[in-house]
Design a protein with these regions (language model features):
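Signal-transducing coupling segments at domain and membrane junctions
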Residues: 47-60, 86-89, 114-115
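A generic structural motif
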Residues: 56, 80-81
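Conserved acidic
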Residues: 20, 63, 87, 91
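Sensory beta-strand/linker motifs that couple input domains to effectors
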Residues: 72-79, 101
Length: 116
């Protein structure tokens, strides 16, 4: 199994175990950091991106992957590596889909209850 496949399995286990959104996202960032020199999740708050959980040193601009919930961008996954190839992008886009429900900081549910 590829490194991305192993990381995806670990992330799926984290999501299956559940917990509060902050803890889940920190654990996902830690898994990704084993393969990328910097990983961070930025949340859309009042139209601005605000950095949340992150690991590593952000020496250059990261590759950014939008994180959506109900077809609206709610956050962004950023990673830095020597090289990001097409396989990395597919993997990171899959991770973004999986963690979308955990990235609803400031999300207006209109009073409706929600759970990831």
């Amino acid at each position: 199994m590829s490194a991305a496949g192993r990381a995806l399995e670990r992330i799926e286990r984290i999501l299956d175990h559940g917990g509060d959104a902050d803890g889940v996202l920190r654990d996902v960032v830690a898994v990704l950091h084993s393969d990328y020199s910097w990983v961070g999740i930025s949340f859309v708050e009042e139209g601005e991106l605000v950095l949340g959980p992150a690991l590593g040193e952000q020496a250059v601009q990261p590759t950014r992957i939008p994180i959506s919930y109900e077809n609206k961008v709610v956050a962004e996954l950023g990673v830095i590596a020597d090289e990001i190839d097409a396989r990395d992008r597919v993997f990171l886009e899959r991770v973004a889909v999986l963690i979308g429900p955990y990235c609803l900081v400031g999300w207006d549910t209109g009073g409706e209850a929600w759970s990831p």
